[in-house]
Amino acid sequence: MHSTVTHRPKPARSKDGELRHLMNLTAVGVTLAGVILLSVILYAAWAANSSASAREIALFGNAVNRSILRLLNEQKSVAWWDEAYTAITDAKPNTEFLETEFGIFLSETYGHDIVVILNPDNKPIFMYSGGARRSADDFERYRNVFAPVLAEIRQVKGRSLRLRPDLFGANQKNYRTIGSPLQSARWTGHLLTVDGAPAAVGALTILPNVDKSLLKPGRPHVLISVNTIDEAYLQEQGRSLLLSDLTLGKTANTNSEYAGMPLETDDGKIA
């Protein structure tokens, strides 16, 4: 008797089955490629939006620096002036001159919301806001706000405010009229919260600009001005930055079409 070895051969794969398998693989590959492409597109869109937001934030920061420069230049137009220096440093300051040339001029010509002049002892000799003169008691509500700015002017050691570029100082290099008094001049500008709103705050020492013999020894008087950042300010900045929808809000805008950021002042607070 002979033994016989048998086996069941595997059925041959039909051409239709191979084609179906190939089509399935192709479909999976196309789907995977589509997912990858979509991910790349979404990432590119996210990266573009992030880059645009960062650029717009940088533009706004630069606009604030330019606003501080403008504020200091506006202050300089009256603070560095022989007649103003004499009116302030006389034994009895000329209050009518101060109201006209500092209070009314700076508020109505340039839109300064608060104007303050402090004597060498940091006591207010003049304050103007809301279209009227204010008392020394009115200044007390702002003393803590202005304290770090005044400390910089008086060169008190220890910086408590964010360092900003000195655009104003860079513009004084060609100033020859003031001469030696300019060497003792001090100025600073910052973004702070004043009366619950963000504001540009500028401080400048008061000097004669022609007659150097008028300059008295000791610490100088200081002019402080406040320019509140409100909707009108933002609209002006938005036009210059080509950001027509620039706005200020107390809460974050949840609209995905808008990019928002907290407005941090130079003392580290959120305005």
Feature map (PLM): residue ranges:
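Positive-inside N-terminal membrane-insertion signal
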Residues: 1-34
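Juxtamembrane extracytoplasmic/periplasmic/luminal helical "stalk" adjacent to the first N-terminal
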Residues: 19, 29-91, 111-113
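Short, hydrophobic-rich beta-strand element in sensory/regulatory alpha-beta domains
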Residues: 75, 112-117, 245-249
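Extracellular/periplasmic ligand-sensing ectodomains of membrane signal-transduction proteins
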Residues: 87-94, 106-180, 223-236, 253
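N-terminal post-signal-peptidase region of extra-cytosolic proteins
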Residues: 97-102
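Generic short beta-strand
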Residues: 105, 114-116, 189-190, 260-261
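Generic detector of solvent-exposed, compositionally biased contiguous segments
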Residues: 158-210, 256-258
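Extracellular/periplasmic juxtamembrane segments that couple receptor/chemosensory ectodomains to their
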Residues: 193-221, 229-230, 239-244, 250-271
